[in-house]
Design a protein with these regions (language model features):
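Beta-loop-alpha module in the N-terminal Rossmann-like domain of NAD(P)-dependent dehydrogenases
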Residues: 1-35
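A short helix->loop->beta-strand "cap" motif at the edges of active sites that frequently abuts
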Residues: 12-14, 39-41, 152
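Structural detector of well-ordered beta-strand residues that form the stable sheet scaffold
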Residues: 17, 42-44, 74, 122, ...
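Rossmann-fold dehydrogenase core element
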Residues: 31-48, 68-73
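C-terminal capping/lid region of NAD(P)-dependent oxidoreductase domains
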Residues: 41, 68-72, 280-296
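C-terminal glycine/acidic-rich active-site capping loop/insertion
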Residues: 48, 175-267, 296
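Predominantly a Rossmann-like dinucleotide-binding segment in NAD(P)-dependent oxidoreductases
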Residues: 49-136, 286
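Contiguous beta-strand/loop segments that form the cofactor/metal-binding neighborhood of enzyme cores
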Residues: 101, 107-194, 238-255, 277-279, ...
Length: 296
C-alpha cells in the first residue's frame, strides 16, 4: 500500500504525489493526511478529473450562476468487460478496492461540485455477470445514492456488466443543466431552449481520440486498462500534462485558489474514501449509512 512510503516521505520533509485511490480505508487516509499536515508538505492525489477542461468550464459556469443552484448530480461509468480485463490487478478487490475505489474519479468530482461529503449514502449491487475466477472478485454492478443537506442528491453507477456503455457526469441545476460525456466526448450546457457545446479535453483532437477509443473497446472495455510499456492515450496524456504542470507550479510557489486547496492536502482524496467506505458498509449491512459513522 501507499501508507509506508507516504509516511516516510512526509517524515523526511518531502512533498508527496500519490496515485488514486490513496488507500483503501479512511483510517489509512487519515494517517497519511495528518502526517503530511504535521510535516508541512504538499500531499496531492492523482484525481485527474479536476484537470479536464470540461470540468473546469463546468465549475466556472456553476460559479457564475448559469445553471442556478445544483440540485442533483448523476455519474455513470458503465461498460462490458470480457477477458481483456482478466490480466490486471484492478480486478482483485484486496488490491484495488473494486470499481468504487479504483474508479473514484467520479465520486471525487461530485463531492467537489456538491461541497463535500454527503450526509448519508446507500449502495446496492453485486457480481451479476463475472463469477468465473478469470475475472477476479470485484462486484460488477454498483448503484449509489448520496443524500446532501437542503434536499440535494447524487447518484453514481459503476460496473463492468453493462452492454450499453455509458460514461458521463450530469449536473442538474435550478436554471439549467450540464452534461460532460466521455463516450461521445463533449460537454453540453442546456439553459431553457438554448444549448452550448464545449470541449472536455484540451483540443478537438483529444476529444475525438477518446470517442474513438470508447467505440473500439465497446465489446470489451477491459482493454482500456493501462499496462507497462503501453503509450498513454492522447486525451490521457493531455490531462496528465495539465496535472503535472499544476503540481510543478505549486511546488515553485504559484498561488493556489481555494478550489484546489483540498487537492493539495489530501483532504479531498481522504473524503472520497470516507464516502466509499460508507458505501461499502451500506452494501455489507444492507442499510443507509451516515458519513459520521466513518469520519469519527
Amino acid at each position: 500500500g501507499c501508507v509506508p512510503p507516504v509516511l516516510a516521505a512526509a517524515g523526511h520533509g518531502l512533498h508527496v504525489f500519490c496515485e488514486k485511490p490513496i488507500a483503501l480505508s479512511f483510517e489509512d487516509c487519515r494517517e497519511m493526511v495528518d502526517a503530511c499536515r504535521d510535516n508541512h508538505v504538499v500531499f496531492m492525489a492523482g484525481h485527474v478529473m479536476n484537470f479536464f477542461r470540461g470540468v473546469r468550464k463546468a465549475k466556472e459556469l456553476i460559479g457564475q450562476g448559469v445553471i442556478g443552484d445544483i440540485l442533483y448530480c448523476h455519474g455513470a461509468r458503465n461498460a462490458w468487460e470480457g477477458t481483456g480485463a482478466s490480466e490486471t490487478w484492478k480486478k482483485t478487490r484486496s488490491k484495488s478496492g473494486g470499481h468504487l475505489y479504483h474508479h473514484i474519479h467520479e465520486l471525487d468530482c461530485v463531492q467537489f461540485l456538491m461541497g463535500g461529503c454527503p450526509e448519508t449514502v446507500t449502495m446496492a449491487g453485486g457480481n451479476a455477470a463475472h463469477r468465473d475466477d478469470r475475472f477476479g472478485d470485484e462486484d460488477d454492478m454498483l448503484f449509489i445514492t448520496m443524500e446532501y443537506p437542503d434536499r440535494r442528491y447524487a447518484v453514481l453507477e459503476y460496473g463492468s456488466a453493462f452492454r450499453w456503455q455509458e460514461h458521463y457526469l450530469l449536473i442538474q441545476g435550478t436554471r439549467g443543466a450540464i452534461k460532460i460525456d466521455m463516450c461521445s466526448c463533449g460537454m453540453t450546457l442546456k439553459t431553457g431552449e438554448k444549448e452550448e457545446h464545449f470541449l472536455v479535453h484540451r483540443t478537438k483532437e483529444e476529444d475525438d481520440d477518446r470517442t474513438r477509443i470508447y467505440r473500439e473497446t465497446e465489446r470489451d472495455n477491459g482493454n482500456q486498462f493501462g499496462r507497462p510499456g503501453r503509450k498513454p492515450f492522447l486525451w490521457l496524456q493531455g490531462i496528465m500534462d495539465e496535472e503535472m504542470e499544476f503540481l510543478n507550479n505549486v511546488l515553485h510557489g504559484a498561488p493556489v485558489t481555494d478550489e484546489f486547496l483540498p487537492l493539495l492536502t489530501g483532504e479531498a482524496a481522504r473524503n472520497s474514501i470516507a464516502t466509499a467506505d460508507a458505501c461499502t458498509l451500506s452494501l455489507k449491512e444492507d442499510r443507509k449509512v451516515k458519513l459520521s459513522e466513518i469520519m469519527k
